[in-house]
Regions:
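Hydrophobic transmembrane alpha-helices and their helix-loop junctions in integral membrane proteins
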Residues: 1-138, 142-173, 179
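Glycine- and aromatic-enriched alpha-helical transmembrane segments of multi-pass membrane proteins
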Residues: 185-186
Length: 186
């Protein structure tokens, strides 16, 4: 529907300050979301910052006002929804609701379905292939590069920061943990 409206009404495609607001706001969300996800104090904060990142990607796609960007943004929103559902399912199996990174340590070995769910959700947020986030981010990245190469260069640091934060989460899921033996009362 949105794509049809964009092709029927040319005045929707005129360059306005609103378009620049969408693009700059989305770029800020991508970079800030990636940086905050890398420095997240808890896994719950990580997923909140990952949602900021993925929302920023979608806003940039919509802000480009081209068919490729709008299609990528729609796919990014579908990816975000599915990643949230999978992450919620993974967190249901985590003891203490994952209030600390130590709660996730070794989760991939002790509760494999929860570890896989959290790993897949993290990879979806960061747009790793073959998940739906990758084609969404690729379409938006290509549309940004076609519109102005500097936009693509500005998206890249946020993507790299998010990828690094995903590796942090994945390492936490598979590395051996101490468990909760340190808290066992005598």
């Amino acid at each position: 529907l949105v794509l049809r409206l964009l092709t029927e009404y040319d005045w929707l495609l005129t360059v306005t300050p609103l378009i620049y607001t969408f693009i700059l706001g989305g770029l800020a969300s991508v970079i800030l979301g990636g940086a905050l996800a890398l420095a997240a104090p808890t896994p719950r904060h990580w997923f909140a910052y990952a949602m900021i990142f993925s929302t920023g990607i979608a806003v940039v796609g919509f802000g480009l006002f081209v068919q490729q960007g709008a299609g990528g943004a729609a796919l990014a929103l579908v990816n975000r929804t599915l990643a949230i559902l999978v992450a919620t399912a993974g967190f249901r199996a985590v003891p203490n609701l994952a209030t600390h990174w130590d709660d996730l340590r070794g989760m991939g070995r002790h509760v494999p379905p929860a570890g896989v769910a959290l790993g897949v959700a993290a990879a979806a947020f960061a747009a790793f292939p073959p998940l739906a986030g990758f084609p969404a981010a690729w379409l938006i990245y290509r549309a940004a590069f076609d519109a102005a190469p500097v936009l693509a260069y500005l998206l890249a640091p946020g993507m790299v920061l998010m990828a690094l934060s995903v590796f942090r989460l994945l390492v936490t899921l598979v590395e051996p943990g101490e468990g909760h033996a340190r808290e066992t009362p005598l």
